[in-house]
Amino acid sequence: MDQQGMVKKRLAVLVGCNYPNTRNELHGCINDVLAMKETILSRFGFKQDDIEVLTDEPESKVKPTGANIKAALRRMVDKAQAGSGDILFFHYSGHGTRIPSVKSAHPFKQDEAIVPCDFNLITDVDFRELVNQLPKGTSFTMISDSCHSGGLIDKEKEQIGPSSVSSNISPAIETTNKTITSRALPFKAVLDHLSSLTGITTSDIGTHLLELFGRDAGLKFRLPAMDLMDLLETMTAREKHVDSGILMSGCQADETSADVGVGNGKAYGAFSNAIQRVLNENEGAMKNKQLVMMARDVLERLGFHQHPCLYCSDQNADATFLSQP
């Protein structure tokens, strides 16, 4: 319970996209979210009924489309209560991409996005809008094991990022036979796929997304550039309380994340696996920044060239990961 005697809810949405039987197929994403589900059930006090899992396994009744993912996130936010201290958690494993940005002074002139199974992209703007809808006193932790995931919550403060000091650990790559696949989809690959569905010849990705998904398309694609900039400024100005968003990304915005296949068929995401290793080796509560830095160290020791990042307020950087009981 919180200080006011309200019962603290722990709510989660876990999404894994393997894109089976396509040229973009991955192998470890569903394993990632199933492992995370077991972890939050056994260690962090989550209940089975408060966890929604979306995967693109053939037998899955509800696929992780863009609309379904956003609907699940909205349901989670709607269940949260102001002043309750509710813990909201979103884990995504799948492809990520970058698309041309309309925002001024953007360091890479591109926006980050995740790639649901139907390619209805969810961008950093959509996640910013979601965070701004959180009731006061709740928190939203997002782990994205995808390429270009740094900065996936727009305007979130960088705590651990490209400017962070390296730990200088000597790599000691494991000798187990592995197959490494990037969890990145280049913009052109996304554009070509959408164009094959719409039959429209244009490099404007928004045209394709609006044609295919209409009002279910992301906010970035439904608003003209100037209106979007005005909305972003308005959302930032109205955010008076401490920002409740916490993003742990599998890599920097200009990097790729690895999908690792091993001989026994137990594939996994490199970042998700690093998180699991750190948690398994440390039973006590951990600060968010500790978890990310230790995951960085694990990846460096294993020889992976990706650098997990942390984006959140100063206060949340020192907060306990998922408020471990």
UniProtKB/Swiss-Prot annotation:
Q: What is its EC number?
A: 3.4.22.-
Glycan-linked positions:
N177
Q: Which GO terms describe its molecular function?
A: cysteine-type endopeptidase activity; cysteine-type peptidase activity
Top-level lineage group: Eukaryota
The post-translation modification note in this UniProt entry reads:
The two subunits are derived from the precursor sequence by an autocatalytic mechanism.
**What broad class describes the main subcellular location of this protein?**
secreted
Instruction: Please name the GO terms of the biological process aspect recorded for this protein, alphabetically.
Output: proteolysis
Tissue specificity, per the record, is: Expressed in root tips, cauline leaves, flowers and siliques.
Record site feature (S-nitrosylation-insensitive cysteine), residues: C29
An annotated GO cellular component of this protein is: apoplast
Site feature Cleavage, where: R183, A184
**Locations listed in the record:** Secreted, Extracellular space, Apoplast
Q: How is its activity regulated?
A: Inhibited by serpin ZX and nitric oxide through cysteine nitrosylation.
Keyword Membrane in the entry? The reply is no
Keywords, A to Z? Apoplast, Autocatalytic cleavage, Glycoprotein, Hydrolase, Protease, S-nitrosylation, Secreted, Thiol protease
Is the keyword Cell inner membrane assigned to this protein?
no
What is the active site of this protein?
A: H95, C147
Q: Name one Pfam family in it.
A: Peptidase_C14
Impact reported for C29A: Reduced proteolytic activity
Q: Which residues carry this modification: S-nitrosocysteine?
A: C147
**PANTHER family tied to this protein:** METACASPASE-4, METACASPASE-9
Biological role stated in the UniProt entry:
Cysteine protease that cleaves specifically after arginine or lysine residues. Does not cleave caspase-specific substrates. Required for proteolytic processing of GRI.
Concerning its family, UniProt says: Belongs to the peptidase C14B family.
What name does this protein carry? Answer: Metacaspase-9
Source organism of the structure: Arabidopsis thaliana
From which lineage does this chain's organism come?
Answer: Eukaryota, Viridiplantae, Streptophyta, Embryophyta, Tracheophyta
Which gene is annotated as encoding this protein in its UniProt record? AMC9
